């Protein structure tokens, strides 16, 4: 196995504990937690560093990690596809310490850094970092500036500067080792946090300005970008509070997210014609911005793009724009008029929230939806035209507007052709008949209307919002008309007396928790054409006795029938290409992953299944015994949790992993055989199994996790094999009758609370 190797600057060193080996590439796994401490070279005093940045040589990974007062840091690897590098910078962004390249594993490291003094004090002219596959990266110091050199293309990227005060002149070309290199870009973080920088001369030939390159340069007051620049990176000028003007050339085709975020002195911006998208947060919190020109080339405006631009009094959105994302203009308190162009289909959540100066809004006929809080707090709007095309309006879309506040009458309120909300207390035994031509029912429209017993929905309705009938506890039946394609999140949740519902053939999606707690439902006919059933869509529908999944269903969220304890029959149409119920097994099997997704009290697990999925049998109150066939290797999280009448489980030798809470609260489970091949038992796996009296820990297990046997009151004896090296907190907590614990080995770490409230335990 080949070790990672690097050639690193002589001006800095990375030291690890002598007992730790140099890590190899295969040890760099996503999710690995890296921890360490930063110290100054030749001094044991810890340093408080502003941040440690994790990134690869292509800068595709970035995370900011603050150290504590003792210089300790910790972060989790998100990508391990490249050599990882760590930058340590001082609190004000100046390069107090130079670049450190290193490989990381789970070991604890000390990073020892030499102060970076620049070229004059440092005789080393270059540094090289070599990737595992042989690619070499050359850094060179020339006239107080540091560059990433590309010998093949004869180009150089400005990486940092030893003097970041006053005006900095970036050369068009540098000479290094008697060869000329064209400076073609400013690298990520080049002038990061240089508060003393007041000006910068950027020559022609520069094509890119990197991510955070001038981040926090609060003294920078104006920037002229030359022709030829194509990209401005993410947060390139973020926090440049003194920046009054920036000239963006027509050659720019891309400006990254948050590019000018917080440039509070910036008064105007002209976006060049080549830009097609204004990225999220591009001008957010530019509180002095009064004028913006958006060209016809722009087709989308990202979330928060102009949020908090309090001085922006007018903005022309060109007809080319098709998408405006949520909160794009939130808090633009000086904005007076807005025209939503033809082609935009949705006014998204919070788009104009808090625009208190807004008095006139023109919405085009292409708009079909208005999101939650879209005009919330727009107190100046006294009238607004809602086109007939709108069939979906989110909660509090017009909250606080003068126009909406004028609607004082109790009863059903329509906004345009949308049944928006029921005001006041609904009388008992109310039947609502929606008027012909109604196109939608808004989010939360009838939520908590306990008096509603029935509703007639016309065929013109095409959309029913999330939570629309949630907690209508006396609603007994409903027919959804053809044309509706989605039952939204929590649409009928806690409709406890809903016993009959007719779903249309047009339905393609049932979202998460759509029928949560509809305990009176005994059957639901899922129409052919339905493609998706969301997470816990039928949670605690205890009256359901059967489930029939049509051939069209291709996606299911986690535990769609969680807590449906009355289900006795499960059938999947034979034409389904994703799910199956082979040999009348009364279960839903994902055929690609060979995972049992949902089971019931009559399930017979078929051969070929390799995993019992998360929550597959959770709260299955009528399940008394289950035999798991050979070939199953994993019991998922909460797989049999809360099966309170489960008495017998047969596990095959093939099982290697038992997930968190897999058998938690199985109160009747008196014994279970755990194969010796099991190497992982998750937290709380057997918590609350009160009837278990003895348990044999498998020889392959190394750790007994937290809460594994919490509250196993009947447990009297436990044998810990010598393979177990640690026992977590509360692993045997509240095992009040535990009288005998036999340890086969001595080298074991026991957490302080592992046996808390076990009066019979002594070690």
PLM feature spans:
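Short, surface-exposed beta-strand/beta-hairpin micro-motifs centered on an aromatic residue
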Residues: 68-77, 189
């Amino acid at each position: 196995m080949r070790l990672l190797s690097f050639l690193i600057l002589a001006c800095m060193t990375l030291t690890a504990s002598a007992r730790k080996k140099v890590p190899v590439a295969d040890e760099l796994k996503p999710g690995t937690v890296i921890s360490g401490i930063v110290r100054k070279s030749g001094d044991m005093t810890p340093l408080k560093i502003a941040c440690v940045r994790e990134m690869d040589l292509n800068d595709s990974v970035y995370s900011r990690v603050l150290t504590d007062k003792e210089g300790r840091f910790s972060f989790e690897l998100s990508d391990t596809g490249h050599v990882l590098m760590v930058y340590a910078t001082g609190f004000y962004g100046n390069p107090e310490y130079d670049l450190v390249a290193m490989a990381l594993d789970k070991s604890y490291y000390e990073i020892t850094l030499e102060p970076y003094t620049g070229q004059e004090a440092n005789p080393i002219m270059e540094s090289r970092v070599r990737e595992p596959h042989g690619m070499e990266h050359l850094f060179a110091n020339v006239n107080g500036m540091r560059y990433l050199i590309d010998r093949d293309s004869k180009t150089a990227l400005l990486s940092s500067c030893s003097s970041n005060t006053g005006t900095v002149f970036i050369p068009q070309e540098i000479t290094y080792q008697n060869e000329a290199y064209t400076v073609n870009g400013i690298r990520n973080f080049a002038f990061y946090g240089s508060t003393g920088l007041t000006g910068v001369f950027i020559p022609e030939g520069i094509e890119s300005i990197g991510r955070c390159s001038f981040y926090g340069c609060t003294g920078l007051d104006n920037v002229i970008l030359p022709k030829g620049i194509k990209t401005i990176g993410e947060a390139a000028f973020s926090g440049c509070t003194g920046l009054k003007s920036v000239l963006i050339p027509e050659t720019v085709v891309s400006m990254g997210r948050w590019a000018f975020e917080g440039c509070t002195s910036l008064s105007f911006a002209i976006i060049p014609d080549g830009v097609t998208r204004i990225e999220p947060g591009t001008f957010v919190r530019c509180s002095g911005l009064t004028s913006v020109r958006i060209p016809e080339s722009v087709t989308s405006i990202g979330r928060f793009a102009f949020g908090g631009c309090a001085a922006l009094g007018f903005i022309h959105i060109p007809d080319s724009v098709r998408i405006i994302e949520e909160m794009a203009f939130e808090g633009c308190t000086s904005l007076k008029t807005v025209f939503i162009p033809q082609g935009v289909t949705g006014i998204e959540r919070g788009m104009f929230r808090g625009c208190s100066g807004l008095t006139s809004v023109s919405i085009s006929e292409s708009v079909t939806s208005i999101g939650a809080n879209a005009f919330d707090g727009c107190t100046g709007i006294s009238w607004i035209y809602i086109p007939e095309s709108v069939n979906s309006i989110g909660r509090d879309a017009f909250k606080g507007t003068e126009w909406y506040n004028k609607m004082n009458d109790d009863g059903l309120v329509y906004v345009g052709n949308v049944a928006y909300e029921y005001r006041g207390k609904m009388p008992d035994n109310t039947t609502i008949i929606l008027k012909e031509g109604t196109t939608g029912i808004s989010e939360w429209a009838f939520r908590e209307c306990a008096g509603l017993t029935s509703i007639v929905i016309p065929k013109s309705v095409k959309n029913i919002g999330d939570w629309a009938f949630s907690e209508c506890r006396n609603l007994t039946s409903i027919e959804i008309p053809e044309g509706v394609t989605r039952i939204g999140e929590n649409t009928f949740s806690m409709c406890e007396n809903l016993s009959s519902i007719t779903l249309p053939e047009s339905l393609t999606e049932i979202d998460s928790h759509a029928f949560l707690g509809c305990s009176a439902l005994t059957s639901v006919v899922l129409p052919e054409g339905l493609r998706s059933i969301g997470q816990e869509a039928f949670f605690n529908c205890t009256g359901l006795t059967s489930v029939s999944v049509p051939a069209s269903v291709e996606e299911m969220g986690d535990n769609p029938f969680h807590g449906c304890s009355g289900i006795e029959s499960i059938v999947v149409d034979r034409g389904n290409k994703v799910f199956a119920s082979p040999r009348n097994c009364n279960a839903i099997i994902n055929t690609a992953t060979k995972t049992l997704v949902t089971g019931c009290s009559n399930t017979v697990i078929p051969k070929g299944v390799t995993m019992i999925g998360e929550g597959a049998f959770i709260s299955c109150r009528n399940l008394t015994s289950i035999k798991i066939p050979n070939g199953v290797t994993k019991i998922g999280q909460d797989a049999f949790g809360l099966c309170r009448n489960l008495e017998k489980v047969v596990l095959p030798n093939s099982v290697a992993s038992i997930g968190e809470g897999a058998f938690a609260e199985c109160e009747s489970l008196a014994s279970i055989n755990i194969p010796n091949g099991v190497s992982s038992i998750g937290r709380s796996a057997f918590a609350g199994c009160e009837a278990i009296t003895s348990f044999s820990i498998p020889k392959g297990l190394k750790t007994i996790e937290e809460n594994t046997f919490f509250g196993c009151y009947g447990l009297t004896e436990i044998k810990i094999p010598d393979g177990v090296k640690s026992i977590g907190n509360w692993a045997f907590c509240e095992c009040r009758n535990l009288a005998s614990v036999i340890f086969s080995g001595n080298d074991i770490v026991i957490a302080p609370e592992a046996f808390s409230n076990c009066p019979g335990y002594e070690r």
